Amino acid sequence: MNRRDFIARGTTLAASSALAPAKLLSQAARADGCLGPAPAVQLYTVRDALGRDLRGALRSLREIGIVEAELYGLNGPENATLFGLPARDLKRAFDENGIRVPISHIGGDLMSSGAIADIARALGLEAVCVALPSEFSGTVDGRFAMVPAKGRAQLDGLAEKLNRVGREYRDRGLTFGYHNHHIEFTRVEGLVPYDYLMSNTDPDLVKIELDVGWLATAGVDPVAYLRRHAGRVIACHLKDYDPKIASDVPQRKLVPPGSGSIDFAAVLAAMRETQVPRGFIEVDVSDDALLDVRRGHTHLQMLKGCA
């Protein structure tokens, strides 16, 4: 399943006891000379390579230096993105390649929490994050598109749903988080939808996965948002933004860390300051995904001062 189908169909780790404490993760990182989160990738970046040869792609990621990954497209037993493998076999493939998978994205319809939780436990996940709520997805000229919020009433309903789903996952031993795009920063009725949603959801039930590339696309300072939501951000998506790329497709302007306009030294410093334990490299659209992961990894490792 590609992300367009995944999002269109229905369409992370500070204070929860279910997750490894940020302090311990930071100490582990310093043990190998690095200041910052362990090298990690959102697997959607390398979806084509995984589809061709799952184990080969995982070996390639491990050779680059990736030790953590985030899964995507987990919607329930009928369409989970498990690459044709039972959940336990997929976990074994990750384990054999020394890659931990603590988080997965889930579909925007926010259904099937029980079934998803069962799969998550089999995979050894600690958290799930909604990639894009169905309220913000639609079609334009017959093609998938992200659509802005319609108004306060819609946002009130979504906030209520996020709290309810967050409670359902908490009761099943999982942390629930919200992953942003740029569309939540399009004002409606004088409101910034993202800010309104975060103000009207329970921080204990709805954590934050902050996508710094989409924040930059929206003209928002990632460092300011990391500090604003200190203690609530469980992970970041680390992608860069290049406004000079000529494209009507916003995903095309999202590039590997170090290839755009974002100050990742400042982002990593803010992540350390606010104790965000995980950061996943992601490039939404890539002509050479593994090369982009390597480029982003090299840049971030340099900024983290790795030995």
At which residue positions do the language-model features occur?
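N-terminal pre-domain/capping segments
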Residues: N2-A127, P133-S134, R152, K207, ...
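Histidine-acidic metal/acid-base catalytic patches
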Residues: R4-A40, L50-R62, L191, M198-K207, ...
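Active-site acidic/histidine proton-transfer and metal-coordination neighborhood
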Residues: G10-T12, S16, N75, I103-I208, ...
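Active-site beta-loop-alpha junctions enriched in small/polar residues
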Residues: Y44-V46, Y72-N75, I106-D109, P133-E135, ...
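Flexible, glycine- and charge-enriched loops at secondary-structure boundaries
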Residues: G51, A80-F83, A87, F144, ...
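Charged helix-capping and loop-helix junction motifs
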Residues: G56, F83-R88, G151, L155-L162, ...
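Generic enzyme active-site microenvironment
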Residues: E68, G177-H179, E209, F280-E282
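Short, well-ordered coil/turn elements that cap or connect secondary structure elements
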Residues: F94-I99, R164, D171, P203, ...
